[in-house]
Regions:
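Generic C-terminus detector
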Residues: 95-129
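C-terminal substrate-binding/catalytic lobe of Rossmann-fold NAD(P)-dependent oxidoreductases
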Residues: 1-95
Length: 129
């Protein structure tokens, strides 16, 4: 998005699956919390628009609970291909901060690679010989 500044930090913790990131965001025009949640949860990228088999139907879910997302509870959202976001709060330096969770081996590796191949095929970059 135009005029957006983002910083983030990922801390590796001993869990079987899942990467958690704390993200700090600054906008030129500060949106409301409701606008941010709507933008995240309604986002659809090319994989969703093309209806690719490995694409999650809902790419990002927002969790209202103060202690979410959590690896044990949320890492398998959309069979591990979706992103869970929560703890959206105003920030005194940036405009907003939130926590994001993704499945590192499904979304980040194997499933992500399959989804990339599906997208390349759908866009005509991979064809039969």
């Amino acid at each position: 998005a135009e005029g957006i500044t983002i910083t983030s930090q990922c801390i590796r913790v001993p869990v079987l699956n899942g990467h958690t990131a704390t993200v700090f965001v600054k906008f030129r025009k500060n949106p409301t919390k409701e606008q941010l949640i709507e933008a995240m949860t309604s986002f659809k990228g090319a994989p969703q628009e093309l209806g690719l088999p490995s694409a999650p139907k809902q790419f990002i879910q927002y969790l209202e609970e103060d202690n979410r997302p959590q690896v044990a509870l949320d890492v398998d959202f959309e069979k591990g291909m979706g992103i869970s976001v929560g703890r959206l709060r105003e920030d005194s330096v940036y405009d907003w901060k939130f926590v994001g969770l993704s499945h590192n081996t499904v979304r980040g590796a194997a499933g992500g690679a399959v989804l990339c191949a599906e997208l390349l095929k759908a866009k005509g970059y991979i064809t039969k010989k």
